[in-house]
Amino acid sequence: MNIFQTIVLALVQGLSEFLPISSSAHLILVPELTNWTDQSLAFDVVVHMGTLSAVIFYYQAMIKCLFFDFYHSIIKRQTIGESKLAWGVLLGTIPVGLVGMIFRDSIATDLRSVEIIAYATLVFGVLLGFASWFSHRNKNQKSTISWVDIGFIGMAQTLALIPGTSRSGITITACMLVGLSRKLSIQFAFLLSIPVISLSLILILIDLYHQAQLVNVSLLAMGFVVAAISAYVTIVFFIKLIDAVGMMPFVIYRLTLGIFLFFFIL
């Protein structure tokens, strides 16, 4: 990888990780459309570390609160403050973690085609549009999350293992479908990203441990910085944009991309 490829792929990771457009799909598509070689495992590690750092930095105050209330809920064996939300993040991660580990090899080899990405981009784009429409018309949006909601959202998140689905997209979709407010939907979806990205990072590190690779430290450092900054800016921008215009710009983008990909594979 050269400097230009490093910047482009780190930007793709940082910009698409928290937008409902699928970072995994874009990281597959960019090398596919440009004939670049796949990025190294070491590069995957640093850009995931970058996006993880961004979301932790953005939600640092809330994360401290969640840890505090989670700890005291265990000690006192009762719900305290935001402890239910903390438990929700933990329990909502279990389904995708289990499915991801069980079907890891199949996902890595059988679900990376442009055709699958095209179908997932279109189908889950339409679903995101419906959920946004439903949420807009729902006059009784919930400001708290139930255990049933957590179970449904956690199961829905397993669909993010299909490239083109978008982890943030499917979790926000599920949140809106169960009636959560838009603010809580985005907040819960982004908090869920922390353990999920962490699990992905651990698995990549395990693979990297078993594969000796020569690395360019300066390019890796650049990838981390670009991914972290672009991810943080994206989080800030996305939250403000959603308040102003809703999800439709991303629905339109997904439908346009999906149609383009079908023309590409024909």
Curated annotation (Swiss-Prot):
It is found in: Cell inner membrane. GO terms for biological process: cell wall organization; peptidoglycan biosynthetic process; regulation of cell shape; response to antibiotic. It catalyses: di-trans,octa-cis-undecaprenyl diphosphate + H2O = di-trans,octa-cis-undecaprenyl phosphate + phosphate + H(+). It is a multi-pass membrane protein. One of its GO terms (molecular function) is undecaprenyl-diphosphatase activity. Coiled coil: none annotated. InterPro entries: UppP. It holds the Pfam family BacA. The keyword Ribonucleoprotein does not apply. It is an enzyme of class 3 (hydrolase). Keywords: Antibiotic resistance, Cell inner membrane, Cell membrane, Cell shape, Cell wall biogenesis/degradation, Hydrolase, Membrane, Peptidoglycan synthesis, Transmembrane, Transmembrane helix. This is Undecaprenyl-diphosphatase. It comes from Ruthia magnifica subsp. Calyptogena magnifica. The gene is uppP.
